Amino acid sequence: MSIETLVEEIGGLTLTDAAALVKALEEKFGVSAAPAMVAGVAAAAPAAAAAEEQTEFDVVLTAAGDSKINVIKVVRAITGLGLKEAKDLVDGAPKAVKEAVSKEDAEKIVKELKDAGASVELK
């Protein structure tokens, strides 16, 4: 039996039959279909190292505050969006205003938005 034929046969199984097949294969070969937890831990380590060396940041608007109009003006200036798009972004907070910007640029954007009265996060 070719692999393609086997795949076609397995594809035709009902969910109950497929679950029974998985269980039978687990018992026959002494394995588990559950994902290995070790892989998750190993993947977390590079992510932690990357966080230490982060060079690109996302500026996230969490709330417009009391000066919504001023925040919309600043968002328009930063993003180049039209009035409606900038208003929708501000109304839809929390939303990313700028993504993957340098730390220096991100800090400038955060300062501008905070000066306008917005609540902002740097991620």
Curated annotation (Swiss-Prot):
CDD domains in alphabetical order: Ribosomal_L7_L12
Protein name per the record: Large ribosomal subunit protein bL12
Keywords, comma-separated and alphabetical: Ribonucleoprotein, Ribosomal protein
Domain of life: Bacteria
Protein source organism: Chlorobium phaeovibrioides (strain DSM 265 / 1930)
This protein's encoding gene: rplL
UniProt subunit comment: Homodimer. Part of the ribosomal stalk of the 50S ribosomal subunit. Forms a multimeric L10(L12)X complex, where L10 forms an elongated spine to which 2 to 4 L12 dimers bind in a sequential fashion. Binds GTP-bound translation factors.
Pfam family, one: Ribosomal_L12
Family: Belongs to the bacterial ribosomal protein bL12 family.
